[in-house]
Amino acid sequence: NCISTIDVPTSGSILLDGQDVTRLRGRALARFRREQLGFVFQDANLVETLTGFENIALSLTIKGERPALVDPLVRGMAKRLGVSDVLDKYPNQMSGGQRQRTAAARAFVGNPKLVLADEPTGALDSRNANVMLETLESTNRMDRTTIMMVTHDAYAASFTRRVLFIKDGALFNEIVRGDLPREEFFDRIIEVVTFLGGGARHAG
């Protein structure tokens, strides 16, 4: 909540590209939220009265993107995330995986510097969860967008480059993937979780 600027920390600072976001106020804060942040939630949180295209375009409209660029940007991101075939459908006509990938497209289409993903695979079956994780990983790699993911799932955490373990509200451990294959990184995550006795509240 502090990173997303919903809450203000009692002390300290939060730097994004060298800018302390805790000091932003008024229009500067609104601009930061509009242009620099993207969100992917456990529930897709799509607007039910808008089509897939309109849901993805929403973040561009709020950002004030030039109208001529909206269509190619939306269709390009939809193609990358595999939801081109649902652009004319409403959320209640989509599968769970399609809804979540449409929500991810909405988060990434504006090219934010930071995307906050809160249990993005929590409501998905294993196949769709895997597709979503691969999508997040490839987008991070291709667009250099920082993704901060909160998850209780060690498998989901294994798709990241760095994992922070929080226990009783404090940072307990940190591991970095480096050049490790994902399978070996997953094993390291499991080792830490086992050491915690299942007490790791979040890994992300």
Segments and roles (model prediction):
Residues 1-159, 166:
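ABC family nucleotide-binding domain
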Residues 160-174:
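Conserved long hydrophobic alpha-helices within structured protein cores
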Residues 170-195:
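Conserved beta-strand-loop-alpha-helix hinge in the C-terminal portion
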Residues 194-196, 200-204:
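Non-catalytic connector elements of ABC transporters
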